[in-house]
A protein has these predicted regions:
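Short, acidic/small-residue loops that bind anionic groups at enzyme active sites
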Residues: 91-113, 195-214
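Periplasmic-binding protein-like
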Residues: 9-10, 75-82, 177-186
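N-terminal beta-loop-helix "entrance" segment that forms/cooperates
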Residues: 38-63, 153-158
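Short, well-structured alpha-helical segments in soluble
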Residues: 55-74, 164-177
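Active-site rim beta-loop-alpha module in soluble metabolic enzymes
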Residues: 122-186, 191
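Short hydrophobic segments within beta-strands
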Residues: 10-12, 39, 119, 184
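N-terminal beta1-alpha1 ligand-phosphate binding loop
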Residues: 5-29
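C-terminal functional extensions of proteins
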Residues: 208, 212-213, 221-245
Length: 245
């Protein structure tokens, strides 16, 4: 008998187009018995590209998750659909199920091959991703971050331009001692097969890595038996207030 498992993908960007792109790209990876619901946050930036938009996205993610739980309390895992994982630590602290994001999952897969590079859109992401890798324990494995000036939203909107500039970036990121390259970003989902023939190192699609790692279950175990927040969070959605301990 097929075991039914329920997962949730939250896009912390407010772009429904990006949510659709993510779902269309990762849905073929879902085995029988797996249901993946998708939600898009209603507050924040259309596409996260700086510290401020990342911070707002973390709060919006928690509200979206709490709203979902108020209707669907049984949940087996949550995937944060942004290569930057806003709200990862807060959601992991609060959730009774496993949680990961596109960045953490990609780091996990890439590090199995050894040192890795990242290619992504938006120059402000470089220090943010370096900090995230350090906080997750992948600081030594991350050898290089190559950014392109275009944001993930711009790369998503112009596939021909995206493939050209991302190919050049991946070639630049293929440094000695690097064993794989993460193509990071929700808006970059699906570009890896188009770029791979022109790059000598294996490319890791962050969206694919996200769903693979989430389904495999090799993530930190929840510290809670029931979802909830350690502190009462005032002036937020009623669903958030209902989860306060």
């Amino acid at each position: 008998m097929t075991v039914h498992r329920q997962f949730l993908l939250i896009n912390p960007n407010t772009s429904e187009d990006t949510t659709h792109r993510l779902y269309q790209h990762i849905s073929p990876w879902l085995p029988p018995g797996i249901e993946l619901d998708v939600r898009t946050v209603q507050k924040g930036a259309r596409y996260i590209s700086c510290e401020a938009s990342h911070a707002v996205a973390a709060c919006a993610l928690l509200e979206t998750w709490a709203d979902y739980l108020s209707v669907h309390p049984a949940l087996d895992g949550v995937l944060i659909g942004c290569f930057g994982d806003p709200g990862l630590f807060a959601l992991r602290e609060s959730s009774a199920c496993q949680v990961t994001g596109l960045a953490e999952a990609s780091f996990m897969e890439a590090s199995q091959r050894g040192p890795f590079s990242i290619v992504t859109g938006g120059v402000r992401w470089k220090p943010m991703l370096r900090r995230l890798a350090l906080s997750l324990g992948f600081g030594d494995a991350l050898r290089h971050i190559e950014t392109v000036t275009q944001t993930g939203a711009e790369l998503q909107a112009d596939p021909d331009m995206a493939v050209q500039c991302l190919t050049r970036a991946c070639q630049a990121a293929a440094l000695p001692g690097v064993n794989s390259i993460i193509l990071g970003g929700a808006g970059l989902a699906g570009y890896a097969p188009l770029i791979q023939p022109h790059v000598s190192l294996p490319l890791i699609d962050s969206a694919e890595a996200g769903i693979r790692v989430l389904l495999a279950g090799g993530l930190p175990q929840p510290s809670r038996s029931a979802s909830g927040f350690e502190a009462r969070l005032n002036h937020l959605n009623p669903s958030v207030l209902s989860l306060a301990d």
